[in-house]
A protein has these predicted regions:
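Non-heme di-metal
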Residues: 2-218
Length: 218
């Protein structure tokens, strides 16, 4: 299926463009769209090196998480220096993993990353954990099967959250809503009532990026 990108707001449209078509985001006409040609996301596609990059990414990612868990154990045991070194190493491993993830062409813009994340969560709750739970039940590990299903339900909510955030990004509603909203500065706590968050916090001068819709759950 053909893909076209709006040259103004970068919205991607799948399918042919009609003469009266307008961008759903910025309302530009079809003439402002250019066809997007699919290409490999990385120069290593289909090679052994690509497989090695994925293996390196997985290994570094696991090492990073293990180090954070080990740091927690060391801290509880009273070994502050060892805990700190575990955490320092974890940060190193995170950067190593990022190198290989970027080389694989997997790090996109925020909209692409939200979609990627949502698709990953969808796989986890619809396929991966469902299969794991069934196999655990078959082997008699019923408590673990219940945990797999419990985590699957959480992953489902994660997918829903990512898709809601993606919709906000695509429709430009991250910092502007259709009605009056209470906005809170994530840095200093200043509250603003209005349709949109201010360009800058009038109290601490942090930019609009620090504002979010105020929420109370107590």
């Amino acid at each position: 299926m053909a893909k076209y990108q709006c040259s103004v707001c970068k919205y991607i449209h799948e399918g042919e463009l009609t003469e009266d078509f307008k961008c759903p985001i910025c309302k530009q006409p079809a003439s402002k769209f250019v066809e997007v040609k699919d290409a490999p996301k990385n120069p290593y596609a289909g090679t052994k090196t690509e497989q090695n990059l994925w293996a390196a990414f997985a290994g570094e990612s696991q090492a990073r998480h293990k180090s954070t868990y080990f740091a927690s154990v060391a801290k509880k045991a009273g070994y502050e220096q060892i805990a700190a070194l575990f955490l320092q190493t974890a940060e190193n491993e995170k950067e190593h993993a990022k190198l290989w993830f970027k080389a694989l062409g997997e790090l996109g813009d925020t909209a692409q990353n939200l979609l990627h994340a949502a698709e990953g969560e969808n796989y986890e709750w619809t396929d991966m954990y469902d299969t794991f739970a069934k196999e655990a039940d078959e082997e008699g590990f019923h408590d673990l099967a219940a945990q797999f299903r419990g985590v699957a339900a959480i992953e489902k909510s994660h997918e829903e959250r990512y898709r809601a955030l993606l919709n906000n990004v695509e429709t430009k509603q991250v910092f502007e809503k259709s009605g009056v909203t209470v906005w809170e500065c994530r840095n200093c706590g200043h509250l603003v009532v209005g349709v949109a968050a201010p360009e800058k916090c009038p109290v601490c001068n942090h930019p609009q990026a620090y504002f979010e819709v105020r929420k109370e759950n107590y």
